[in-house]
Amino acid sequence: MDADSDWRSAPFRQKLVSQIDEAMRKAGVAHTKSSKDMESHVFLKAKTREEYLSLVARLIIHFRDILNKKSQAAATDPMNALQNLTGTAVVGGQGMGMGVRPQGAQMGAMSGMAQMAQQMNLPGQPQPGASGMAPHGITGVAAGNQATQLQLQQIAQHQQQQFQQQQQQAALQHQQQQFQVAQQQQFQVVAVAAAQQQQQQQQQQQQQQQQVQQQQQQLQAAAQQQHILKLQLQQQQNQQQQLQQQQQQQLQRIAHLQQMQQMQQQQQQQQQQQQQQQQQPPPQQVMQLQQMQQQQVAQSQQQQLLSTQPQAPSLVAQGQIPSQVMPVTLTPQQQQQLKILQQVRAQQQQQAQHQAQQQAQQQAHQQAQQQAQQQAQQQAAQQQAQQAAQQAQQQAQQAAQQQAAQAHLAAGQVTQNSIPVMSSPSPVQQVQTPQPMPPPPQPSPQPSQPMSQPNSNVSSGPAPSPSSFMPSPSPQPSQSPASARTPQNFSVPSPGPLNTPGNPNSVMSPASNNQSEEQQYLDKLKQLSKYIEPLRRMINKIDKNEERKKDLSKMKSLLDILTDPNKRCPLKTLQKCEIALEKLKNDMAVPTPPPPTVPSTKQQYLCQPLLDAVLANIRSPVFNHSLYRTFMPAMTAIHGQPIASQLVVPRKRKFEEDERQSIPNVLQGEVAKLHSKFLVNLDPSHCSNNGTVYLICKLDDKNLPSVPPLQLSVPADYPDQSPLWMDNPRDYEANPFLQSVYRYMTSKLLQLPDKHSLTALLNTWAQSIRQACLSAA
């Protein structure tokens, strides 16, 4: 069993109960509780071994104190005790045995008892120290009573034993107290050490918690930084994507512009080449004709050899044979046909050279007529070039649609059509055909001049009508000029009427209409480009308005039509868009384009850009507001506040006395137009004999503090002269706030122009008070 819990055991408690019982018995105290009850009460009250032992020790000491008090009371009267002992020896002995004295009292009693014994043993002989005892009546005691002597000796021995026991108990108690004090000190030291350790542990725990919190804060800061970095990266990626999209859009626009420029350059080059060809002599025309024929022959051969599907028939130059699309695979018969075509084209080239020589001989006689027809031929050549280009596109689409119908007709058939170039009929043209042919075009004095176009197989020869390219349902065998020289006959569709440049009765083909519509579309789109920016502003303005969602969708579709080149709409739709934009013109505030300026040879005026800007925006509904907002501050700084004058000229008075009024009309009108916070009255302390008006102005503004009124003098020739402030420094020396108002007022008056109005002066006064309030705050 542990030392801390052995005090709870029954033997240990029984031992202490016996000690308490012995102490009670020695003290001779009659108590209602027994020693066991007292011990159980102490046991229940104590919580530790030390507390239990200390309570039991106090109980035993209490009984011993009672015993000591009784022994002291018995020792104060020894003669009475001896008399009691002579009567009842046994009872006296018991009574003496119950008393406990201090050490000095016990020794005195013992010496007295010894002296008494000596006197008893030797009667009649006085002993030293016994003379003081005679008055107490010891002489009356029998000297020969031996029983009494024995009793006294027993009592003395018993007292000595008790004294020794008391000394031993006192020593034990002293040792126990020292032991308890030492234990308490040890417990205190241990408790202090434990408390210090606990404090250290708590401090360490707090430090660890602080470190953990710091680490958590660092982790949170790192996480926030990572989140911020992620957001920055996302923003950078979004910006890069936007930049890439913008760059792609710009590249697309640049590519579109480059294509348009290339097309324009090609058209210009074609026109220049046409003009050069018209101005060149006939030998140069022959050389160009030969080169074009050779190039087109080579191109037609490559197309026929490499084509995998039927293609649209192309227009050829004068003297060439337009051929239909060859089938996908070339048979030996088709190869022979190609050779025959090459031979025919070579013969036609020779004929063209012969005809060119004849034309050169006749050119001297035809110069007068040539000059008259030259302009008409140039226009016709340009129109035919445009028609040929558009017809080629249309025919390509038609050929793609009719691919299935022409598949069984394309095999073994080669369409040929000879176009006369010479003015006089050649032997080839004089060959008769079984089928009646349309009359050949009338020979013109000036031969039709070919028009070469780069990178195209379109020539300026006569443009056959669309019917010439469509195979007839039941083609009749006809003998072409080439068939007169070849053993084979080819079935060809009946040619339609030919329109040559020299034929004044030639009909315009649908291609010219398409070209004109294209030009009109581009012009209209360019005309409507002025609505793009106002339309965007209008869309941004009503984007958040849910009530105008329909208008918003319409506006967005209009903007897409005007800005997106990929969205192509008919010309009629574009005209409807123009009508809708005209209706929205007032809402969008579209600036009207300035009138076309006539280029002048003189030096440009210095303010011409400003005048142009004014002319461009003069019809805008916000023009006057913009002018007022732009120029009004500068004009106010130069001339001061505007003064509202009476426009109605006052009638002249009959008498001079009536002409001089007390208050001028200008001043009355200005005072009437003042803000309601300014209360203006005439100063009764001054008399205006010379026309000067003295006023007292008060400020009634709930947002500003109350200040002394302002005294003003308005001269008679106001507004030619400015009003004056009759400053009185005494009114503004009451407190620092009024002093600051006075300083600000004097400084602001110096900033006013030389000519200023009463309104400007009062506004300056209110501004000074407001500025003083701000500085005081």
Curated annotation (Swiss-Prot):
Disulphide connectivity of cysteines: none
| Superkingdom in the source lineage | Eukaryota
Task: For this UniProt record, give its keywords in alphabetical order, as a comma-separated list.
Answer: Activator, Cytoplasm, Nucleus, Transcription, Transcription regulation
Q: From the Swiss-Prot or TrEMBL record, state where the protein is found.
A: Cytoplasm; Nucleus
Mind listing the GO biological process terms from this record? regulation of DNA-templated transcription
Spell out the molecular function terms from Gene Ontology. transcription coregulator activity
Q: Where does this protein chiefly localize?
A: cytoplasm
What family name appears in the similarity comment?
Belongs to the Mediator complex subunit 15 family.
Q: What is this protein called?
A: Mediator of RNA polymerase II transcription subunit 15
Give the gene name.
Answer: med15
